[in-house]
């Protein structure tokens, strides 16, 4: 493990009331002696001048020193809390970097040090970035629960259960004359089914956490003048898009970030789909299809005042081009003009909603539908946040536990059961970082802020 001493600004770049520089590593006390002219007592606040190499005072503020291992990173840590002007922060940072053995921290390197020194596991370290980036109160509460170890504790309980079961199975393998009796006595199967049930519950909670963290990408598509931009404005609660009676008004992609009962949604309005001759409009339509192909759900907007035969043709042509794995919802807009009732129905396996973006009648049905389609459940207490890699690891663990159950109940193959349990344990342990590649660590921590 690197024993470098690193420094970075811990507060956001720019002007502020307070600016903080963080130093972590074996030379932290030496930095204090050279910049402050004083050896600091651990965990005691000192109000001191911060000096340049020639003794000129650069700033004055509070200095805090934490002796390893009793710090965030597990290393010696010095924090200098001064005035938040960026020039002042830059001068102080430049001064510290003049000291031999000090270098600028990489993005996320403080959190990486904390992980490598067993102050945080990997899921907790990721929760720091998630807490900073939280886009809603519920997401922030859930990220804090992950940081406090709620997600990690659930994973560790699963890992401990798998290890216990592996020990039992491998003990049976060591006594081949009695192996079948051990495997067939029902205890292993009972324990394995209990683990699978617990994992299913954690998977469901993790899915909710992933929705809270990443949101749902919803693309509004359809022919010109169907009311796509009006629906975007209604969902956004503001005039985000220009709305006119002129077909093709929207020529580029418009994005809005909204929340429905705490669930983040990325709503994307696109250019009307038609055979365009205008070059600018053609570019907009190509961009529309690019967004459609990356969506979590498509809202195909139809003008319910038009002839039904024409609408059926529009829908069939769109579905013929739509990638089959992308969920589709049909929205029959302008119900206030066509006289249709504002309802949510199902036709040929597709959700069909009649509404009026102009009067907003039926729009709440759409909001509820979007929540239900993602399996989102409102939780007033908040759960924990999860990432896509967590969901993938949980899914792989489930696959191998299920495979182990088959090897147990159908073939009584003790060695194969043990191997499936080992692989499941490995995938679960990847979440907290017990088994993690250096490449994965690099990808995770490089996405952090410099000072975290």
Swiss-Prot record:
Binding site for GTP: 225-230, 244-250, 269-272, 333-336
Main localization (coarse): cytoplasm
Cofactor remark from the record: Binds 1 potassium ion per subunit.
Needed cofactors: K(+)
Subcellular location: Cytoplasm
Positions that bind (6S)-5-formyl-5,6,7,8-tetrahydrofolate: 22, 79, 119, 452
One Pfam family it belongs to: MnmE_helical
Keywords of this entry: Cytoplasm, GTP-binding, Hydrolase, Magnesium, Metal-binding, Nucleotide-binding, Potassium, tRNA processing
UniProt-listed GO biological process terms: tRNA methylation; tRNA wobble uridine modification
EC number(s) per entry: 3.6.-.-
Binding site for K(+): 225, 244, 246, 249
GO terms of molecular function: GTP binding; GTPase activity; metal ion binding
Signal peptide: none
Domain called TrmE-type G: residue spans: 215-375
Binding-site residues for Mg(2+), renumbered to this chain: 229, 250
Protein family membership: Belongs to the TRAFAC class TrmE-Era-EngA-EngB-Septin-like GTPase superfamily. TrmE GTPase family.
NCBIfam families recorded: mnmE_trmE_thdF, PRK05291.1-3, small_GTP
Name the record gives this protein: tRNA modification GTPase MnmE
Species classification: Bacteria, Pseudomonadati, Pseudomonadota, Gammaproteobacteria, Pasteurellales
Gene this chain is encoded by: mnmE
């Amino acid at each position: 493990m690197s024993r470098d001493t690193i420094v970075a600004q811990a507060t956001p770049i720019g002007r502020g009331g307070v600016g903080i520089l963080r130093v972590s590593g074996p030379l932290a006390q030496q930095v204090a002696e050279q910049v402050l002219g004083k050896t600091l007592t651990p965990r005691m606040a000192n109000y001191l001048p911060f000096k340049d190499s020639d003794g000129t005072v650069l700033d004055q503020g509070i200095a805090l020193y934490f002796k390893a291992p009793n710090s965030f990173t597990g290393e010696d840590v010095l924090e200098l809390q001064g005035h938040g002007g960026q020039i002042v922060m830059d001068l102080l940072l430049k001064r510290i970097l003049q000291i031999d053995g000090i270098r600028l921290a990489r993005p996320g390197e403080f959190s990486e040090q904390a992980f490598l020194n067993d102050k945080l596991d990997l899921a907790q370290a990721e929760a720091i970035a998630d807490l900073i980036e939280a886009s809603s109160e519920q997401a922030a509460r859930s990220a804090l629960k992950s940081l406090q170890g709620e997600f990690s504790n659930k994973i560790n309980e699963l890992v401990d259960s798998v290890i216990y079961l592996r020990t039992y199975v491998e003990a049976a393998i060591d006594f081949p004359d009695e192996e079948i009796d051990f495997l067939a006595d029902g205890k292993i199967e009972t324990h394995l089914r209990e683990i699978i049930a617990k994992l299913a519950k954690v998977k469901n909670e993790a899915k909710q956490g992933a929705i809270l963290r990443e949101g749902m990408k919803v693309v509004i598509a359809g022919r010109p003048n169907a009311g796509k931009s009006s629906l975007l404005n209604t969902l956004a609660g503001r005039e985000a898009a220009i709305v006119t009676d002129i077909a093709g008004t929207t020529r580029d992609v418009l994005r809005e970030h909204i929340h429905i009962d705490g669930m983040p949604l990325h709503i994307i309005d696109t250019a009307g789909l038609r055979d365009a001759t205008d070059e600018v409009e053609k570019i907009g339509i190509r961009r529309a299809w690019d967004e459609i192909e990356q969506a979590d759900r498509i809202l195909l907007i139809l003008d319910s005042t038009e002839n039904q035969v024409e609408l059926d043709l529009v829908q069939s042509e769109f579905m013929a081009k739509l990638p089959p794995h992308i969920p589709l919802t049909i929205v029959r807009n302008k119900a206030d003009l066509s006289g249709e009732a504002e309802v949510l129905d199902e036709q040929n396996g597709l959700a069909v909603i009649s509404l009026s973006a102009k009067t907003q009648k039926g729009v709440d049905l759409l909001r509820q539908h979007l929540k239900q389609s993602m399996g989102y459940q409102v939780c007033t207490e908040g759960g924990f946040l999860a990432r896509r890699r967590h969901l993938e690891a949980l899914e792989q663990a489930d696959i191998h536990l299920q495979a182990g159950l088959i090897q147990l109940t159908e073939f009584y193959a003790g060695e194969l059961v043990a191997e499936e349990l080992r692989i499941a344990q490995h995938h679960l342990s990847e979440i907290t970082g017990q088994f993690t590649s250096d490449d994965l660590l690099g990808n995770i921590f490089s996405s952090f802020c410099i000072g975290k």
